[in-house]
Amino acid sequence: MSKEKIDNKRLGYWASQEQYSMQDLLKFVVEAEKCGFDSCMTSDHFHPWWHDNGYGNFTWIWITAAAERTKRMQFTTGVTAAVYRYNPAIIAQAFASLDILYPGRIGLGIGTGEAMNEVPLGFDWPEAKTRLARTTEAIQIIKKLWRKEEDVGKVKESEGNERSYYYDNDGFLYFNGQYFKIKNAKLYSPPLMKIPLYMAASGEEATRIAGRYTDGLITVQKPDKSKEIFDIFDKSASEQGKDPRSLEKIAKPKISYSEDYDKALKATEFWRASLIEDVFDLDISDPRKLEQKAKEEVPDEKVKESTLIVTSIEDLIKPIEEYFKVGYTRVYIHSTSPNEIEFIQVFCNEVLSYFNDATKM
């Protein structure tokens, strides 16, 4: 097999807050860094996808504990939904504070979310168009609150989907959006570094928004289905004067590894509900109902197709290379393996070392 020259730093570890306890996830990221991973993307949910053995960890708190226990690991949410339960100004403040504590090690992933994370808190679940519009405004507010001093005092007019806003001479922000209003707000503890902001997208309009406003795209598209969405993202970014080559394209393939195939297959069951048809548009927030619906409607073949189920870790090398060949810049490894510590160690010894050797060729 000819080796693709891929920097192993472009491989990251995915931490599933819905599937594991906070204590176990801390053990996993410490082991992952020790073995060679230097970045982690982690989910941000209120409810899990699955009722049986599910968890509901508060991701922002976990990131602080994880960053304290690691030395260089970068942490990014995948993704935080700025729809209802999180006000965008609070997101901006929280991640600015994280960056002050761990400068250069914090990133923010934004998305339109799922009903399971909003409806339990008393909110309605709006249509996709409304969720995207709210998310777009939230991204603008977050970026404007993070903005550096050179913008202070400059009045900005509405531009396309961008709502009227301005800063006064002391740097206080006024934002008049359709969904969010900011009145004389200022981060007194701004971020020390530029915090990368990414957006999860798979549809055309969301991808255009990602290209226009953010530093990168997070998508679950398979390599052979990615060209169209990349073209939309690149075009949107270029129209804003950005070089698409400077932006991230992020994938998160789901993997289950065990030398025993049946054990590897069984470990994928936890994610069956994420494969329900049009699940992001459904007003179902109860994990018990999601689990039951998944068992009734999602066939085993669909589960197998959605996950790389392997009994030999080397069988992951070619599929991962395919992501990079089509243009992905970073791949976060989302393992649902029956023994996670074993997976991390074997993956690092066989796969990370493979790509590390490839960079020396």
Question: How should each PLM-predicted stretch be described?
Answer:
Residues 1-361:
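Active-site-adjacent structural elements that line small-molecule/cofactor binding pockets in enzymes
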